[in-house]
Amino acid sequence: MKKNKLFTSVLAAGIALTSAFSVVGCGRPNPDGSHGDSGRADKPYDNTKTQVQIWTYNAGFKDEWLYQLEADFEEANKDTVYEAGKKGVQVRHEGAMKEWSSDDIKNSNFDVFFMEGGDYYAWRQSGALEDITSLVTSNSAYDNKTIRSKMNDKQIAYFGGVTGEGVQEKYYALPHYKGAMGLIYNVEIFDEYGFYISDSETTSLISASNPNKSKGPDGKTGKENGIDYSMDDGLPATYDEFFYLCGQMLKRGVTPFMLPGFYSDYYINILYNALVTEYEGIDQMELNMSFKGNATDLIKLNSDGTAIVKKNGEPVIESATIDYTNGYDVFRQAGKYYALDFVKRMVSKEDYYNEDGFNTAFTQTDAQEMFIKSGTDMSVSDERYAMYVDGSWWEAEANIIFNNMAKKDSKYSKQNRKFGWMSLPKANKLKFEEGNSVFLDSLEAAVCVKANLGANKKAALDFVQYVCSDGALDKFTDVTHALKDFNYEVSKETYDNANYFTKTLINYNKKSETFSYYSNTPFYLKNRSDLLPTKVNTIGVQPGTPVTILKDGVSAKSAEDYFLKSYAYWKKRGSAFWKEV
């Protein structure tokens, strides 16, 4: 039973809304005529140095990483002459949560942009961005490597504008950070209560009579090729094991989930996409971008599409070639059905989550504080929460909470606490035996340079080259406890000094493939607004997302009901829509 409900004022909801949709002015000057960083008292404007003005999407990752990289870059170039009569460089930034149009970029006074979301192909086709191809393909002055060498084939095609055979690479932006929505678990609570699946043939928790943990979702244990497969030992390997664990938590007086209220709908919606991606794998997920290719795991429907064909209670799976005649069949992918069932089981049982789990006056920072303090002597409630739905960047966002707790007792510092990034469970035993792990990056984060800069252009380009160097990538991870979207090795020093959460995230990333939710296929670019992960599974069944609809049980009473209605919607878009594939 829940013993304490946090009553947050309506004012807090207003603040949350303001924060979520706030925008920054397009390079408004400070009183001294400078731009950016006006609030940083230890960094006064210095007109004896070349100025580079940065805009950053300042949300969950915050901007401490940027302050540190700016300082390092300034030190490395303190004697560099970028402009006649000036020596050295000063980098200053502003930031908020905002998506930029091409005209916004052209009319701003910023030189470099760290973006999240936004239409990259609209920007590059409008002439708003600088061609940075030579920067990407030349050896860097900071690590003697090309940035291109740290990118995968999909990134090269997307950022390089390779839209067809024979098209030459031309870069106007580069990857930035990488973020996934997932489950964070309180390892301290898991350890205290023994919330680990045992290696018994029948599903059970570890106990005095059997303290041996299962091998977890990856099906392995021990260390191999720099990966510690034992870090997920005992974590639930399948959906059924996961919800068995939730039931055991309730029996022991622990609430399984902390949900972020105002953002619960959005966060769980992205978690749903992560579950789909984990099920489908890279190749099958790409069908959601291209709508061309061989689909191998479509759920078979009856002749009029109103029911799922089942055998022994499970959906029958079939294959099909996807093209312009049947693009809608991608919405029969089995991963979507099973992920919907996971969401249904998660949100329809109110005892599974905090009372403010869907209260819009309760924010993600409220949730972070309650989750972090849960089980400690600083909690205002005796309620304990085992898991939290948030992004892989959550520790950077919750930094103030950790710091305030550490001021009262060092044992509560971020370094000394023990949270973990949970490997997602598999839909069933068959998917578990396949052994695939996929990290969904849905942020569309990028760094780019404004076109037609003046005397500071070289400094701006150098800064972008620097932030993509190995040392800067490593420092980003060290500061944020999160990842950049490049192929780089976190240094031994950074890993050894990292807290437990960071190690679990790095380890999970090492053993997983990454699926980036963007594409430069013509069909996707034309219909991007409908096909984004935040939108694609929200427009077929109204009103709301799978999360609220399955929670309320009105528009769709079950995962199967929602699945069929969503498929029907995309099929009804008709040949005029799908022929463009």
Protein language model annotation of sequence segments:
Residues M1-Q51, S575-V581:
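Short, low-complexity disordered leader/linker segments with a strong preference
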Residues G85, E165-E169, N225-G226, E383-R384, ...:
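Extracytoplasmic/periplasmic substrate-recognition and gating elements
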Residues G117-G182, E188, T203-K223, I299, ...:
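Hinge/lid segment of periplasmic solute-binding proteins
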Residues D46-T48, V52-Q68, G179:
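Extracytoplasmic "Venus flytrap"
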Residues A59-G85, I184, E188, L271-L275:
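Short, polar/charged alpha-helical segment
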Residues Y244-C246, D283-D366, L424:
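Glycine-centered hinge/linker elements that transmit conformational signals in sensory
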Residues T480, T502-V581:
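C-terminal capping/gating helix-and-loop segments adjacent to ligand/active sites or protein-protein/ligand interfaces
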Residues K78-Y158, E192-Y193, S379, A386-M387, ...:
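Extracytoplasmic "Venus flytrap"/periplasmic binding protein-like
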